[in-house]
Amino acid sequence: LDLSTAKFALPMFSGKDAEGPNMEARCAPLTPMTTLSPGRVDRTIEYDLLTDSWTSITNGVGGVFGEGIYRFDDIGTVVEHNLKRELTMSNKDPLSAKYTITQKMKNGRDGWLTDCDIVVTQTADKDNFYITGHMDASINDEHVFHRDYDYKVKRNGI
């Protein structure tokens, strides 16, 4: 783009047209792995008659998508990722909405195992969003990290 002349120039393609994508495409073999524990995804929706509120829970046990706890056999690394999503809200008050994610991530192999626990909650009022939570991390069962989160973000018309 040349603003002094208001000309917009694009390069011209000078190669040969392709037949299309290679329908015999090859890829590397899958990494050998073993499922150590089968996973599942539980889903529930509950309605509370007394508070006129709903709770929706999606709970990935042994994997975010239910893939289970698995080990990459060549290197011995084990992966476990559990993720629970919980949303609650009253029919009478949209500002009562509360969304919490509880996450556990374990990775490692013999002599080196990380374990992280993360909980984050989002709520709101008419002016702000609030994000609170914490993270704890351990290596080989020794606690090595903690952080608390507490943020307020203006809604700016949202």
Model regions and ranges:
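Glycine/threonine-rich phosphate-binding loop and adjacent beta-strand/alpha-helix elements that clamp
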Residues: 1-158
